[in-house]
Amino acid sequence: VVLSKECAKPLATPKVTLNKRGFATTIATKNREMMVWQPFNNKMFETFSFLPPLTDEQISKQVDYILTNSWTPCLEFAASDQAYAGNENCIRMGPVASTYQDNRYWTMWKLPMFGCTDGSQVLSEIQACTKAFPDAYIRLVCFDANRQVQISGFLVHRPPSATDYRLPADRQV
């Protein structure tokens, strides 16, 4: 991941002083230390969503890691209005809140890739799914058959029309 020069700089150590009652206080030495998280059009998805979009090479390394651990990769996709957890697109069994991340379902691209040992197979399926649904969110999830749980999930494609994402430099005000 390549960060901008501004992001790569370490933050200055804040100056610690004691107030009249003996409590430690800090004084922000730079404006960057007092920034506020941008709550609008700054949505995140699962693992790695705080990073800039992953390159094909970075996705390939993640796929290799998944296969090295004998996990089962699976592609899922969703339209932009169905991708985020919300009251409109969640399946409920009674009065359940929609804040739990798995309380919504994405459409599975084909079947999970059971027994897949070649990362290029996964990458070609990502390309095929992207070609078929260019304006959909596409994520790669992986499952551990021994523990019977989802291990990880991350976006491999964000639609070009998406306006709900901010670059790391624009995430704070």
From Swiss-Prot:
Job of this protein: RuBisCO catalyzes two reactions: the carboxylation of D-ribulose 1,5-bisphosphate, the primary event in carbon dioxide fixation, as well as the oxidative fragmentation of the pentose substrate. Both reactions occur simultaneously and in competition at the same active site. Although the small subunit is not catalytic it is essential for maximal activity.
Miscellaneous field: The basic functional RuBisCO is composed of a large chain homodimer in a 'head-to-tail' conformation. In form I RuBisCO this homodimer is arranged in a barrel-like tetramer with the small subunits forming a tetrameric 'cap' on each end of the 'barrel'.
InterPro entries documented for this protein: RuBisCO_ssu (IPR024681), RuBisCO_ssu_dom (IPR000894), RuBisCO_ssu_sf (IPR036385)
Family the UniProt entry places it in: Belongs to the RuBisCO small chain family.
GO CC terms in record: chloroplast
Pfam families given in the database record: RuBisCO_small
Localization: Plastid, Chloroplast
Entry's Gene Ontology BP terms: photorespiration; reductive pentose-phosphate cycle
A Gene Ontology molecular function term of the record: lyase activity
Subunit-structure text: Heterohexadecamer of 8 large and 8 small subunits.
Alphabetical UniProt keywords: Calvin cycle, Carbon dioxide fixation, Chloroplast, Lyase, Monooxygenase, Oxidoreductase, Photorespiration, Photosynthesis, Plastid, Transit peptide
Stored CDD domains: RuBisCO_small
HAMAP family recorded: RuBisCO_S_bact
Protein name: Ribulose bisphosphate carboxylase small subunit, chloroplastic 2
TM segment ranges: none
Span of the transit peptide along the chain: 1-33
Metal-binding recorded as keyword: no
UniProt key word Plastid: yes
SMART domains found in the cross-reference section: RuBisCO_small (SM00961)
